[in-house]
Amino acid sequence: MSDIDRNQFLIDHEPYYRPVSNEVALYEAAYAARMPVMLKGPTGCGKTRFVEYMAWKLGKPLITVACNEDMTAS
């Protein structure tokens, strides 16, 4: 991904996120160890907001894809 493409997916302001437990430290440890992370939970529980916050905090681009039970493989 070129810098021009990358920059359009950077989060330019700090998203509001209030940690509930130690999820930020756990994510940072997984990121440092290059371990994949899977977030699972019901609609509206904060998964997207959390990854937006972590992308901003780590200075990484973020591309989101909405997936649900109506989505097909084609």
Swiss-Prot record:
<comment type="similarity">
    <text>Belongs to the CbbQ/NirQ/NorQ/GpvN family.</text>
</comment>
<keyword id="KW-0547">Nucleotide-binding</keyword>
<dbReference type="Pfam" id="PF07728">
    <property type="entry name" value="AAA_5"/>
</dbReference>
<dbReference type="GO" id="GO:0016887">
    <property type="term" value="F:ATP hydrolysis activity"/>
</dbReference>
<dbReference type="InterPro" id="IPR027417">
    <property type="entry name" value="P-loop_NTPase"/>
</dbReference>
<feature type="binding site">
    <location>
        <begin position="41"/>
        <end position="48"/>
    </location>
    <ligand>
        <name>ATP</name>
    </ligand>
</feature>
<keyword id="KW-0067">ATP-binding</keyword>
<dbReference type="InterPro" id="IPR011704">
    <property type="entry name" value="ATPase_dyneun-rel_AAA"/>
</dbReference>
<comment type="function">
    <text>May affect the post-translational activation and/or assembly of the oligomeric structure of RuBisCO.</text>
</comment>
<dbReference type="GO" id="GO:0005524">
    <property type="term" value="F:ATP binding"/>
</dbReference>
<protein>
    <recommendedName>
        <fullName>Protein CbbQ</fullName>
    </recommendedName>
</protein>
